[in-house]
Amino acid sequence: MNIQLIKNFNPILKINTQSSNIKLNKIIPNEWLFILMNTGSFTQNLNSLLISDININISQKYNYNQPQQFHNTRTVWLANNNNQRFAFAQSRWIIKNNYTNYLNLLNNKPIGKSFIINETDLHKKIEEIYCGHSYILEKNFQSQQLIWGRKYTLLYNKKSFIVIQEYFSPNLTKFLKFH
């Protein structure tokens, strides 16, 4: 299975949202602030913005090597019906003990949708916001503008079990204009 991780993202701005006293609205454009700080389902928001279904291309790699522990790496491209890509996400799951309860969440659906279907209550803790350049992302987004992204942790029962990094196409701002 082809797991494509973004290792060569070159940030020119990186903000730790947990320890920063920076007023984000002073340095991040409103269009991006809306996307980056939203704690809801990005896939659902993208469906609403584009008023069309989003195609999801998922690759996963499982690792059961350690007893009582489960590892999963998952990459996702979100695109419209014309195969225009709007977001790339990579997630790393480390689940200790009783990981079989989580296996039904690992399907070809967006993570948020899986949790909604399984009625799992989560909290999204946004940890970092960044913008920069990446040849791979610029090629896939068909844009050489700055790429914004974020890193967050999903918490279940106040415990971290999934870390997600998302990178967003600069073309998204065409659908979000705040004046």
Curated annotation (Swiss-Prot):
<keyword id="KW-0934">Plastid</keyword>
<keyword id="KW-0150">Chloroplast</keyword>
<dbReference type="InterPro" id="IPR028978">
    <property type="entry name" value="Chorismate_lyase_/UTRA_dom_sf"/>
</dbReference>
<dbReference type="Pfam" id="PF01947">
    <property type="entry name" value="Rv2949c-like"/>
</dbReference>
<dbReference type="GO" id="GO:0009507">
    <property type="term" value="C:chloroplast"/>
</dbReference>
<dbReference type="InterPro" id="IPR002800">
    <property type="entry name" value="Rv2949c-like"/>
</dbReference>
<comment type="similarity">
    <text>Belongs to the ycf21 family.</text>
</comment>
<protein>
    <recommendedName>
        <fullName>Uncharacterized protein ycf21</fullName>
    </recommendedName>
</protein>
